[in-house]
């Protein structure tokens, strides 16, 4: 099943493809030889474009790793809170060491009717 993002990518990406990538059949009566790439050829990407693409994908990769680490840390903290051992004896010992509060009033005496 295709995701909705794939449709958007195809809708906007296909018109941007170079015309040289079209699926039309070549004309058999024309010369289809190409010149070897040289300094004057404009067919490849410039070094500035390559640097820009590298920088963009590097930033996206770093952001993806940062988001992944953030989600991993959040999941580990959640797991640490929900899983563990319960030791009531240690809580009882801590409560026994605390002195009783001063001026503790007794509850009212219950009487029979």
Swiss-Prot record:
<keyword id="KW-0472">Membrane</keyword>
<feature type="topological domain" description="Extracellular">
    <location>
        <begin position="25"/>
        <end position="49"/>
    </location>
</feature>
<keyword id="KW-0325">Glycoprotein</keyword>
<keyword id="KW-1003">Cell membrane</keyword>
<dbReference type="GO" id="GO:0035003">
    <property type="term" value="C:subapical complex"/>
</dbReference>
<dbReference type="GO" id="GO:0016324">
    <property type="term" value="C:apical plasma membrane"/>
</dbReference>
<keyword id="KW-1133">Transmembrane helix</keyword>
<feature type="signal peptide">
    <location>
        <begin position="1"/>
        <end position="24"/>
    </location>
</feature>
<feature type="region of interest" description="Disordered">
    <location>
        <begin position="80"/>
        <end position="113"/>
    </location>
</feature>
<feature type="region of interest" description="Interaction with EPB41L5">
    <location>
        <begin position="77"/>
        <end position="113"/>
    </location>
</feature>
<dbReference type="GO" id="GO:0017124">
    <property type="term" value="F:SH3 domain binding"/>
</dbReference>
<dbReference type="GO" id="GO:0072659">
    <property type="term" value="P:protein localization to plasma membrane"/>
</dbReference>
<feature type="transmembrane region" description="Helical">
    <location>
        <begin position="50"/>
        <end position="70"/>
    </location>
</feature>
<feature type="topological domain" description="Cytoplasmic">
    <location>
        <begin position="71"/>
        <end position="113"/>
    </location>
</feature>
<keyword id="KW-0965">Cell junction</keyword>
<keyword id="KW-0796">Tight junction</keyword>
<feature type="compositionally biased region" description="Polar residues">
    <location>
        <begin position="83"/>
        <end position="92"/>
    </location>
</feature>
<comment type="function">
    <text>Involved in the establishment of cell polarity in mammalian epithelial cells. Regulates the morphogenesis of tight junctions. Involved in promoting phosphorylation and cytoplasmic retention of transcriptional coactivators YAP1 and WWTR1/TAZ which leads to suppression of TGFB1-dependent transcription of target genes such as CCN2/CTGF, SERPINE1/PAI1, SNAI1/SNAIL1 and SMAD7.</text>
</comment>
<feature type="glycosylation site" description="N-linked (GlcNAc...) asparagine">
    <location>
        <position position="31"/>
    </location>
</feature>
<dbReference type="GO" id="GO:0005923">
    <property type="term" value="C:bicellular tight junction"/>
</dbReference>
<keyword id="KW-0812">Transmembrane</keyword>
<dbReference type="GO" id="GO:0045198">
    <property type="term" value="P:establishment of epithelial cell apical/basal polarity"/>
</dbReference>
<dbReference type="GO" id="GO:0045177">
    <property type="term" value="C:apical part of cell"/>
</dbReference>
<feature type="short sequence motif" description="PDZ-binding">
    <location>
        <begin position="110"/>
        <end position="113"/>
    </location>
</feature>
<dbReference type="GO" id="GO:0045216">
    <property type="term" value="P:cell-cell junction organization"/>
</dbReference>
<dbReference type="GO" id="GO:1901890">
    <property type="term" value="P:positive regulation of cell junction assembly"/>
</dbReference>
<protein>
    <recommendedName>
        <fullName>Protein crumbs homolog 3</fullName>
    </recommendedName>
</protein>
<comment type="subunit">
    <text>Component of a complex composed of CRB3, PALS1 and PATJ. Interacts (via C-terminus) with PALS1 (via PDZ domain). Interacts with PARD6A. Interacts (via intracellular domain) with EPB41L5. Interacts with WDR83.</text>
</comment>
<keyword id="KW-0732">Signal</keyword>
<feature type="region of interest" description="Disordered">
    <location>
        <begin position="23"/>
        <end position="44"/>
    </location>
</feature>
